[in-house]
UniProtKB/Swiss-Prot annotation:
Binding site for Zn(2+): 336, 387, 513
GO biological process: threonyl-tRNA aminoacylation
Enzyme class name: ligase
Keywords: Aminoacyl-tRNA synthetase, ATP-binding, Cytoplasm, Ligase, Metal-binding, Nucleotide-binding, Protein biosynthesis, RNA-binding, tRNA-binding, Zinc
Record text on cofactor binding: Binds 1 zinc ion per subunit.
Region annotated Catalytic, chain positions: 245-536
The protein's name in its UniProt record: Threonine--tRNA ligase
Organism name: Neorickettsia sennetsu (strain ATCC VR-367 / Miyayama)
Keyword Transport: no
CDD domains noted in UniProt: TGS_ThrRS, ThrRS_anticodon, ThrRS_core
Taxonomic placement: Bacteria, Pseudomonadati, Pseudomonadota, Alphaproteobacteria, Rickettsiales
Stored Pfam families: HGTP_anticodon, tRNA-synt_2b, tRNA_SAD
Length: 637
């Protein structure tokens, strides 16, 4: 087939050229400086290697190395180079998958070698060696039979399984670098020499494709960056995040613990439960002032309720099922069907709507043991759950009211940066287009009226309705999706919830699923790390520690402790015979915001020496002044 003349658009310039030229050569001829920074390219919206040959009119956008897309490609390259390094060091190793993840990558390996962090130096040295070899990274498309035959001969059973999962109409592509060959869609950099700044981070176990019934593999995580500064900044971030790990802080502050006999469930200690209750009561009071009615529903239900709601067929694998002589039951994984049952206990008129039912409901989900992580991923959890039953016309006003409530809560809890995402109708959905149109218009209108700036997640709505997601940005600039509001036309109809409209006809209400925190456990984990355990005074489990310099002032110190407690301040005492510098260090480590230090001088002058967390300075104040300072701060959020 002869060459044809193509029209190409590159960086707002259009020109003609012959087909068959590589994308890289086109960019190089156009601007050599830009080409030197380009790792791959987008051709008509599809990311390709620079070796890709043009065969049709094209809009070309260079993917620069330091761009978000460029760094993602670099990390994918590093995953391949790491896999090559591991196989060169340990030839018996077989390969699983090696995708890019947030800020890094991983690769799963099947090997008799038990990897540990101590192996990283050797693997990293081999990676640097492969980078120095500067292998060209070459893409080839193989027939399905050839690909299967090749990987079968190498004993790469996981690659063979991956090929079997590729749709028949999709091409099978592989990438070569030296003698190393891997199954991959790409794109990749032109050569391994593009990699310079990387670090292996940790190793863990993982099931093949996340299936607990499949093989157990070893997963090595790493990160790669376009610049040395980028890598160093990220490693510094990881160091700070490790210091803030809620599991370590939880142990230091005696907040909670976890143990094997109750996997994924939390043992709250006194300090942790105080923190939990303070947060719960704060949310409870907010809900009360915003017109919510608190309910409490059972923990265990017969499967017939879940069959009617649709959860039994779609969610059973994630439910804890109990079998008895009376049939099959389940611990509830969510509260929504139970709230509909509460709603149905009396006849409702349109005048009774909106009805807002809230519950701090204990739920259980059978999460894979490998997915459990401290408070962030548990099996037993409490949701700050509420469901608003309303008419279609009330969706907008209820959404505005909820957004206002959510902003108040996040502000009070110290989160000033919140991202909002709007997810509209997915391809597979229930309900007709007219109903979806009304719901999406109502939600968008509400967000506009509430002054929310949001991004669109096309097609990411729930199958039963569109949704809004609220993403918190913490002190380390990490993002946590916590709040949500979801419109549901389906469940009220499935469970036959109705109201009488103004024409006397039965209608099904719209159900708004909404949460602010998500789950208490996860949100408390986020809070601990956000504040590094150094909570604002109103949240702190212990607000004041009264420390004595000498046992001779113990009676005076006890009277101060009693005074604090009567005022409603959470205070503890330390009258031990330890040195005062030890006491100060101990209670500072436990993140107590305020220390009252008591000696003979303070006793004689009816005063206290006040030391605030984070300060090496102390200040002598009268008891009334010191107490007044606490009360003023305590009442400010």
């Amino acid at each position: 087939m002869g060459r044809v003349v193509l029209t190409v658009t590159l960086l707002s310039s259009s020109f003609s050229l012959s087909s068959g030229k590589t994308v890289g050569s086109v960019i190089s001829d156009f601007d050599a400086e830009i080409f030197s920074k380009t790792i791959a390219a987008s051709v008509n919206g599809v990311s390709v290697d620079l070796s890709y040959r043009l065969d049709c009119d094209a809009n070309i956008e260079p993917i620069l190395l330091e761009s978000e897309a460029g760094i993602e490609i670099l990390r994918h390259d590093c995953a391949h180079v790491m896999a090559q390094a591991v196989q060169e060091l340990y030839p018996e190793t077989k390969l699983g998958i090696g995708p890019v993840i947030d800020d890094g990558f991983y690769y799963d390996f099947s090997t008799p070698i038990a990897f540990s962090d101590s192996d990283f130096e050797k693997i990293e040295e081999k990676i640097r060696e492969i980078i120095q070899r500067n292998y060209r990274i070459i893409r080839e498309e193989w027939s399905r039979d050839d690909a299967v035959s090749f990987f079968q001969k190498k004993g790469e059973k996981y690659k063979v399984e991956l090929i079997s999962r590729i749709p028949p109409e999709e091409k099978i592509s592989i990438y070569k670098q030296g003698d190393f060959i891997d199954l991959c869609r790409g794109p990749h950099a032109p050569s391994t020499g593009w990699l310079k700044h990387f670090k292996l981070l940790k190793v863990s176990t993982a099931y093949w494709l996340g299936d607990a019934k499949s093989d157990s593999l070893q997963r090595i995580y790493g990160t790669a960056w376009a610049t040395k500064d980028g890598l160093e900044a990220y490693l510094s971030f990881l160091h700070e995040a490790k210091k803030r790990d809620h599991r370590a802080i939880g142990k230091t502050m005696e907040l909670f613990h976890l143990q094997e006999e109750a996997q994924g469930q939390v043992f709250w200690h006194e300090n942790g439960f105080i923190l939990y209750r303070v947060l719960e009561n704060y949310i409870r009071n907010k809900l009360k002032t915003h017109g919510y009615r608190e309910v409490k529903t059972p923990l265990v239900y017969n499967k017939c309720l879940w069959e009617r709601s649709g959860h039994w067929s779609k969610f059973k694998e994630n439910m804890f099922v109990i079998r008895s002589d009376d049939g099959e039951f389940s611990l509830k994984p969510m509260n929504c069907p139970a709230h509909i049952e509460v709603y149905k206990q009396s006849l409702k008129s349109y005048r009774d709507l909106p009805l807002r039912l809230a519950e701090f409901g204990m739920c259980h989900r059978n999460e894979a043991s490998g997915a459990l992580h401290g408070l962030m991923r548990v099996r037993g959890f409490v949701q700050d759950d509420a469901h608003i039953f309303c008419t279609p016309q009330q969706i907008c006003d209820e959404t505005i009211a909820f957004c206002g409530l959510l902003k108040e809560v996040y502000r009070d809890l110290g989160f000033t940066e919140v991202e909002v995402r709007f997810s509209d109708r997915p391809e597979v959905r229930l309900g007709n287009d007219e109903t979806w149109d009304k719901a999406e218009i109502a939600l968008k209108s509400a967000m506009d009226k509430a002054g929310l700036i949001y991004t669109l997640n096309p097609g990411e709505g729930a199958f039963y309705g569109p949704k809004i997601e609220f993403v918190l940005v913490d002190a380390l600039k990490r993002k946590w999706q916590c709040g949500t509001l979801q419109v549901d036309f389906v469940l009220p109809e499935r469970l036959d919830a109705t109201y009488i409209d103004h024409e006397g006809k039965k209608q099904h209400p719209v159900m708004l699923h909404r949460a602010i925190l998500g789950t208490f456990e996860r949100f408390l984990g986020i809070l601990i790390e956000h504040y590094d355990g150094k909570f604002p005074l109103w949240l702190a489990p212990t607000q004041v520690a009264v420390l004595t310099i000498t046992e001779k002032v113990e009676e005076y110190a006890k009277s101060l402790l009693n005074h604090l407690s009567k005022t409603g301040i959470r205070a503890v005492s330390d009258f031990s015979n330890q040195r005062i510098d030890y006491k100060i260090r101990y209670h500072t480590t436990r993140r107590v915001p305020i220390l009252w230090i008591i000696g003979r001088i303070e006793e004689k002058s009816n005063s206290v020496t006040v030391r605030r967390m984070g300060s090496s300075e102390s200040e002598v104040k009268t008891v009334d002044t010191a107490l007044g300072d606490i009360l003023r701060e305590f009442n400010v959020r």
